[in-house]
């Protein structure tokens, strides 16, 4: 599937949120939209623009393009419960997201590369599909020939225990993890309002 190839830093500044670790320092230094008039853009934003911005945040944060994102929304609507909560839970169950949450990569983009390049196993079988949805109890680990890669070891060493969520159990020494349970919405700390996205799609 095609992926975004533009400047993630510019998109982060436009949306007002760091979409990747490398964008954090730039956003701290220039917390306004890019361009000549970025600092002066203070006009009132419309309801539609707010909804669209929240959708863009979610898509870029999880690395999902429009068609797939809309499919997640349709699945969320079909499930029992709150549609917005269901949408977030589906995105959190993505294989590349779980690899990122486990600390195997400092970014979701990096985690997606680990998956697509065939470095990862799920329950002992190679899975190279980033959108593969994890189920409670699923175990992830590296293929034998991919273990102890420098980038992974460095990421695990830098990842504080507080960053690894309670719904993922990580064995840093053996570079393994278990997806314990689907997180509740309040456990997912991300800078977006999914309810505005639901309102946008339900029009």
Swiss-Prot record:
Classification via CDD domains: S4 (cd00165)
Source domain of life: Bacteria
Annotated signal sequence range: none
Gene3D superfamilies: Ribosomal Protein S4 Delta 41, Chain A, domain 1 (1.10.1050.10), RNA-binding S4 domain (3.10.290.10)
Gene Ontology CC terms, in alphabetical order: small ribosomal subunit
Annotated keywords: Ribonucleoprotein, Ribosomal protein, RNA-binding, rRNA-binding
InterPro entries, per the entry: Ribosomal_uS4, Ribosomal_uS4_bac-type, Ribosomal_uS4_N, S4_RNA-bd, S4_RNA-bd_sf
A Pfam match: S4
Biological processes annotated in GO: ribosomal small subunit biogenesis; translation
Domain S4 RNA-binding: 93-154
Record-level Gene Ontology MF annotations: rRNA binding; structural constituent of ribosome
Entry function: One of the primary rRNA binding proteins, it binds directly to 16S rRNA where it nucleates assembly of the body of the 30S subunit.
Homology family: Belongs to the universal ribosomal protein uS4 family.
Assembly, per entry: Part of the 30S ribosomal subunit. Contacts protein S5. The interaction surface between S4 and S5 is involved in control of translational fidelity.
This protein's name: Small ribosomal subunit protein uS4
Native organism: Prosthecochloris aestuarii (strain DSM 271 / SK 413)
